[in-house]
C-alpha cells in the first residue's frame, strides 16, 4: 500500500496566513474510495510514468537503431485531488520536491539504457493550474460574480427588442454564446451585424472586460489581445461571441456545480534543453512555444516540420 506523507520536516515548508499548515497523510490502498482518481493527482503517478518508461526501453525497439526516436512523457505537478492551494499548500510544495526526484530518476534511467550523450531533453510546462478560490477580502482585490446564463438571457431579450420575436441565443458554454443561425437566416438578417451589436451589448455588463464577435476575430484588425483570442477560436466550432471576464471575478454556472475565478496574471513556465552539445546557459527572454520544434530540429541537424514558421533559439 502506498502512503503519502511530507518528505521533509514541517518547518521546511512555507505558508501564507490563511493556508492550512497541518501535516498530511494519504493512503492509496485497495479499499479506499476513488483511489485511482486521487493517485493520478499525487506525485506517485510520476514514479509510475518512470516505471512505464523503463519497461518501454526494455521491451521495445526504441533507441536501438540509428533513426532518432521521440519519447514524450507527462509528469503531474498540480494540486492534490484538485483542491485549492489554500487547502493543500504543503502537498503542493512536497509534489515539487518529489517531481525533482522523479526527473532525476528519469535522467539516471536514460543514462543507463541509452546514454545521456545520445539524447536531447526538452522539459516544458503548460503553466496550467487548477482554478483557485476567490481572494479573501483582507487583500481588497476587486471582484464579483458573473453569470453566463443570465447574460445569455438578457442578450436574447435585447435581440428580440431589436429584431422581433425569436430565440436568437441558441446556447452558451465556457464563456461563449452561440447564436441561432437558422433563425437569423430565415429572417434575412445580417449575421455579422448581429454579432457586433451583441458584443457591444455584452461589454456593458459588470465584470466583462471584453466581448469579441466571431466576425471581429476573423476579419477585424490585429492586436496582441485579438491574437490570443484567435488562438483558441475555431470558426466552425466556437461560439459567435467570446466573453473575456475581468480578473478577480468568479464565473458561476447556475445549472451545474461549477465556478472558477478568472486570473490574468502571468504564469511563467520553464523551458529547459539538455544534451546535443548545448552549452549551459540561462536565457531570460520570453519564448513562444512555436520555437521548440525548430530548436530541437536544429540541435539534431534535421529539417524542421513543414508547417513550422518560427526560428530556432540561438544557443
Question: Where is each model-derived feature located?
Answer:
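His/Asp/Glu-rich, glycine-adjacent segments
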Residues: 1-67, 76-83, 206, 210
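Flexible glycine/proline-enriched surface loops and loop-helix/loop-strand junctions
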Residues: 32-38, 87-88, 175-184, 225, ...
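A short beta-strand-to-alpha-helix junction
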Residues: 94, 157-175, 184-196, 262-267, ...
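Beta-strand elements within well-structured catalytic alpha/beta cores of enzymes
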Residues: 53, 68-76, 92-107, 120-128, ...
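Secreted, luminal/periplasmic, and some membrane-associated catalytic domains
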Residues: 2, 13, 90, 105-249
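C-terminal, low-complexity/hydrophilic appendages and adjacent surface loops
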Residues: 237-238, 244-277
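Surface-exposed acidic, glycine-flexible loop patches that form ligand/cofactor-binding
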Residues: 58-66, 111-115, 231-234, 262
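Short, solvent-exposed loop/turn and secondary-structure capping segments
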Residues: 82-87, 132-137, 253-256
Amino acid at each position: 500500500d502506498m502512503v503519502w506523507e511530507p518528505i521533509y520536516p514541517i518547518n521546511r515548508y512555507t505558508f501564507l496566513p490563511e493556508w492550512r499548515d497541518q501535516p498530511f497523510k494519504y493512503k492509496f490502498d485497495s479499499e479506499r474510495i476513488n483511489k485511482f482518481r486521487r493517485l493520478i493527482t499525487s506525485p506517485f503517478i510520476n514514479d509510475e510514468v518512470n516505471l512505464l518508461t523503463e519497461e518501454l526501453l526494455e521491451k521495445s525497439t526504441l533507441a536501438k537503431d540509428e533513426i532518432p526516436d521521440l519519447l514524450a512523457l507527462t509528469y503531474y505537478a498540480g494540486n492534490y485531488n484538485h483542491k485549492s492551494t489554500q487547502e493543500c499548500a504543503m502537498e503542493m510544495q512536497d509534489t515539487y520536491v518529489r517531481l525533482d526526484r522523479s526527473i532525476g530518476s528519469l535522467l539516471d534511467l536514460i543514462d543507463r539504457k541509452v546514454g545521456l550523450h545520445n539524447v536531447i531533453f526538452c522539459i516544458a510546462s503548460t503553466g496550467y493550474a487548477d482554478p483557485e478560490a476567490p481572494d479573501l477580502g483582507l487583500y481588497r482585490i476587486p471582484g464579483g460574480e458573473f453569470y453566463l446564463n443570465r447574460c445569455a438571457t438578457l442578450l436574447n431579450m435585447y435581440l428580440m427588442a431589436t429584431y422581433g420575436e425569436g430565440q436568437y441565443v441558441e446556447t452558451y458554454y465556457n464563456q461563449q454564446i452561440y447564436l441561432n443561425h437558422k433563425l437569423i437566416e430565415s429572417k434575412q438578417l445580417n449575421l455579422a451585424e448581429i454579432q457586433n451589436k451583441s458584443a457591444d451589448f455584452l461589454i456593458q455588463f459588470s465584470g466583462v472586460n471584453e466581448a469579441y464577435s466571431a466576425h471581429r476575430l476573423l476579419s477585424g484588425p490585429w492586436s496582441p489581445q485579438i491574437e490570443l483570442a484567435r488562438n483558441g477560436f475555431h470558426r466552425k466550432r466556437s461560439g459567435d461571441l467570446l466573453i473575456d471576464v475581468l480578473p478577480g471575478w468568479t464565473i458561476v454556472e447556475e445549472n451545474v456545480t461549477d465556478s472558477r475565478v478568472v486570473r490574468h496574471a502571468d504564469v511563467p513556465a520553464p523551458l529547459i534543453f539538455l544534451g546535443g552539445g548545448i552549452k549551459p546557459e540561462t536565457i531570460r527572454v520570453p519564448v513562444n512555444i512555436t520555437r521548440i520544434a525548430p530548436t530541437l530540429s536544429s540541435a539534431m541537424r534535421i529539417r524542421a516540420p513543414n508547417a513550422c514558421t518560427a526560428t530556432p533559439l540561438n544557443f
